Amino acid sequence: DVYKRQLHYYEDIEYSKPDGNLQKAVTSLLGIRNYSIVSTDAVYRQTLCKEQLWRDKGAVGVDMETSAIFSVSKYLGLKAVAMLMVSDIHPIDSNSAKWEWKMTNEMRYNLVDQAVAFAKAINNTK
């Protein structure tokens, strides 16, 4: 079956996770919030049903890279954490507002500034 999930680093894995210490540090140092997300390799394949299933599992967002970064980092014995930003809101039912891109340049620059500040802070603790 072509659509069968391919597991290259683990025989069975449902969730990939950031390093706990880095996650605590980034939320503490930057005062940001921590939420679960879904990481998928299916570009533009979300359906209303999938969106609801993911939300029912506690996910507040969808991205395409985080799972791979966390899985490979763990496999290689490296520590990893992700800082993500909400850029849009997908509809969860046919009555929801139409999808619209909401990210601004100011939001992008702010995220980069926060990431640099975090990298400097953890580098100074070594």
Residue positions per predicted region:
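Conserved active-site and cofactor/substrate-binding residues in soluble primary-metabolism enzymes
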Residues: 17, 21-24, 49, 64-68, ...
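Alpha-helical transmembrane segments in inner-membrane proteins
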Residues: 8-9
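Short, small-residue-biased leader/transition segments that mark boundaries at the very start
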Residues: 2-3
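Generic non-transmembrane alpha-helical segments
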Residues: 21-31, 72, 114-122
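A short glycine/serine-rich beta->alpha loop
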Residues: 12, 59, 102
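Active-site rim beta-loop-alpha module in soluble metabolic enzymes
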Residues: 14-57
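His/Asp/Glu-rich mid-to-C-terminal helical/loop segments that flank catalytic regions of hydrolases
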Residues: 90-126
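A C-terminal functional module that forms or caps the active site or interfaces directly
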Residues: 49-89
